[in-house]
Amino acid sequence: FGNNILDIGSGAGFPGIPLALVSPKKNFLLIDANNKKIIFLNHVKINLDLENVDLLHKRIEDLNNVKFFDTILCRSYASLKTIYSNSINHLSENGVIIAMKGKYPHDELSALENLSKSIRFTVKRINVPKLSAERHVVIIYK
């Protein structure tokens, strides 16, 4: 994961908040375009005393100052192509983008490959106990 982690479209804080709880020495930036969600996350941050979490009310494509992150996480944010295009400039050398998806994203992977044949990625199926729906994680390497 590295030490600097960005959670795009954090919403209610998943996966950023649970990861910050179990990784207190890592730095997390949770961003979301919805200010109500940021207000909620600030409440969670204060109540859980999460000093390793920063919050930002912004869209990733509006993040002007180029910060570099070792890992960029997203869940239900956008297509893989959009995720890659909007976040690759914020990824450190040898960093990874980890995108959570439902069913195997055939079309999204094709669109990502059409963007550049040099994009390297792996897809892993995840089994969630008591959940019959498909879940996959796509890891995109810089």
Residue ranges and their predicted role:
Residues 37-39, 105:
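Short alpha-helix immediately C-terminal to the canonical SAM-binding loop
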Residues 49-60:
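Conserved SAM-binding strand-loop segment of SAM-dependent methyltransferases
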Residues 12-25:
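Conserved SAM-binding loop of SAM-dependent methyltransferases across substrates and taxa
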Residues 61-71:
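A short acidic, Gly/Pro-enriched loop at the edge of an enzyme's catalytic core
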Residues 103-142:
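Active-site capping/gating segments
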